[in-house]
């Protein structure tokens, strides 16, 4: 992996990026049998480190003679204590950041500098496989409105050779300006929130435009942070004119999975250990959905050990080194609460309704809220108002999915409310919040 000039800020801040590259290459060159032993050693090493040097984690585990299967599964709520409480005194220099994730509640986390350098090395490795790392990026993420954080983000954009588009204005006029921008600048790839890029592709569809014809230098599109449904991916590939690559990550951990050239969604097995567990914390068979639980094998600043990231998914293990993320089904706290008290995954429900509603009208975006067991609110952005017949048909399909009578309040909006960083929460059950 070739060292890039954009690593200079990391080096100046004391991040051992050279060492991280060498370590990552060494890991990737291990044989399968060597890799199996490597994982066992790293699991033991990170757990023992935090038990010996991290009083916070020691009190959670309560047993120095631990077994992997008996270690507690931690949630964000378990770890969300003051940073100085969960950082070992042995660690003097570390990286601090925060993420609101899907909850909207700020979550501060820390990584030791080597761990953070490994994250960057891993990102560069994945992006370099597609020959886009360090190339001109059209970036579709939100930006902090805090002046200091805003300036820092802009500085990062400059060093990382990227231009950040305003994802808080998704009007037709704004999209038109984006197209003009692409006609003037030689972007190599797009990178951003799935919902924003889907909306942009729908605008291109309405104008019968293909972005690559406007900007011939385009090679790839990388989507992340939100679910990317198959139909949306095909739409983006058609109107962007390039391959769409799925990325799945968590700021507090690392890059979790990244799509390779063969369209396999490869799990990052180099620095993370990923498990799929049932509600009793037992591993589920390959291909079966469960809670995604991850261990950061290198983070000595915070104990992200058997950490429930809050998502539902399934994997396929080819061998210890090669693990494929087969399905990502969304957040495990975003359930539709059914009349009999059982639950269905909210994004599955959202997808069914989305597929139906987009056939009925020129719908651009939808957002579903479950207000009560039998009452839903459906917000949508469209050039046309849904007719009473269309509303009735959608209501009937919702009843078929849920298997009981429900009422739906349809609200046509000019734009849907997003988080402060520009993400769209596509399904919410307010019942879960009580």
Stretch-by-stretch model annotation:
Residues 162, 244, 274, 407-410:
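Generic structural signal for residues in well-ordered beta-strands
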Residues 50, 99, 137, 190, ...:
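Residue-level signal for inorganic ion chemistry
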Residues 1-98, 103-136, 143, 184-191, ...:
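Nucleotide 5′-phosphate-binding alpha/beta core
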Residues 94, 271, 363:
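Short coil/loop residues immediately preceding or within conserved phosphate-binding loops
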Residues 219, 223, 227-318, 332:
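Conserved AMP-binding/adenylate-forming
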Residues 190, 298-404:
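AMP-binding/adenylate-forming catalytic core of the ANL superfamily
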Residues 144-268:
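Conserved adenylate-forming
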